[in-house]
């Protein structure tokens, strides 16, 4: 019963706010993700990365999510603003496209442009692009995107 209640709330929330994707940062199982996706929701499943071994069990989510998000492992869910060793991305051999998160800042474009993983689909920009929690600095984002496109 609890699962159905959470599933129903997720659908209503996504519909009410016209969300294109839902990003999951918890301990959701592949089955739970599959059930959410079966309702028509598109999912980004976040994985905490601290070492190469952290990529080993990600494959069980391949069929239940639309994208993966690789973020720095930390105590709390949702990110720390710190960067993990991005050279470890070479350990990811899956076919699911992923977004990179964790420690990306306005000065990251030169380093990000050097990343050549075939499944890298984009970047998750958060706290370092905000003037206050939840409010993006449009000028900072514009500058970042210009630098990334150079």
Task: Mark where each language-model region is.
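Short, acidic/turn-prone active-site loops that include or flank metal/cofactor-
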Residues: 26, 48-52, 73-75, 126-134
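Short beta-strand/loop segments at the ligand-binding rim of alpha/beta enzyme cores
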Residues: 37-50, 94-101
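Short Gly/Pro-enriched loop/turn and capping motifs at secondary-structure junctions
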Residues: 74-75, 97, 104-109, 130
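Catalytic cores of alpha/beta
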Residues: 8-20, 24, 30-33, 50-65, ...
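Short, small-residue-biased leader/transition segments that mark boundaries at the very start
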Residues: 1-7
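Active-site rim beta-loop-alpha module in soluble metabolic enzymes
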Residues: 72-84
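Short beta-strand elements of ligand-binding domains
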Residues: 4, 23-25, 45-46, 100
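C-terminal helical cap(s) of enzyme catalytic domains, especially alpha/beta-barrels
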Residues: 36, 113, 126, 130-150
């Amino acid at each position: 019963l609890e699962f159905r209640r959470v599933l129903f709330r997720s659908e209503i929330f996504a519909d009410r706010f016209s969300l294109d994707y839902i990003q999951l940062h918890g301990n959701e199982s592949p089955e739970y993700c599959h059930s959410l996706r079966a309702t028509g929701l598109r999912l980004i499943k976040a994985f905490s990365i601290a070492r190469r071994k952290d990529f080993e069990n990600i494959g069980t989510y391949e069929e239940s999510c639309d994208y993966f998000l690789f973020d720095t492992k930390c105590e709390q869910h949702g990110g720390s603003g710190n960067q993990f060793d991005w050279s470890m991305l070479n350990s990811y051999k899956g076919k699911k496209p992923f977004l990179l998160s964790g420690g990306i800042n306005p000065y990251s474009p030169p380093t990000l442009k050097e990343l050549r993983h075939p499944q890298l689909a984009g970047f998750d920009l958060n706290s370092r692009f905000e003037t206050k929690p939840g409010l993006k600095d449009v000028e900072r984002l514009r500058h970042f995107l210009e630098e990334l496109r150079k």
